[in-house]
Amino acid sequence: MNWWIDQYKQYHAQLSTNYPGNSLKPQLHHIVDLVKDTKSETLLDYGCGKGLQYTKWKHHEELGVMPSLYDPAVPEYEELPSGPFDGIYSTDVMEHIPREHLPEIFNNIFSRADKFVFLAICTKPAIATLPSGENAHCTVESIEFWKTMVEKYAPKRVYTHIKTYGTCNNYSILNEELYLEWYLSQF
């Protein structure tokens, strides 16, 4: 995985506009709804890029809370916070991770999430090319693949929303009964 992260560190360093954090905005309404529905107070943006979605564009104001930030290719966010977090979201990240590293990534995410996980995943090749010449989207798969990965590798069951876009536009909710149990316990 270190080779892959090094590729992204080089890519980030090439231009200040590479992965600034602009993949959050198209998904923000889904995440805001999840934060409100689950009354989440602690969040983690897993794969935040350079973080401009918070420092410049102030998207956290819509969330009602400033999330913790993690991106292994950005020096100021390279330390994975231990959590736990009420909610964890990742937008335009999973498709950048080599298939053989997905079990580790799902463990990192799902072991830290208490109320929800939201994954927005692109299902077509990227415009971006890494310094090695490889396409930045190395795991381009349908929503069924991603659902199977969550079911197989998440160390615990968490209320999960998966949105895919690109060549496979879909939305799926996993473990909805966990949310319903929690919701009903609020009364």
Over which residues does each language-model region extend?
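Conserved N-terminal segment of class I S-adenosyl-L-methionine
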Residues: 1-87, 103-106, 112, 123, ...
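A short SAM/SAH-binding and catalytic strip from SAM-dependent methyltransferases
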Residues: 89-100
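Short glycine-centered segments of the SAM/dcSAM-binding site in methyltransferase folds
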Residues: 115-118
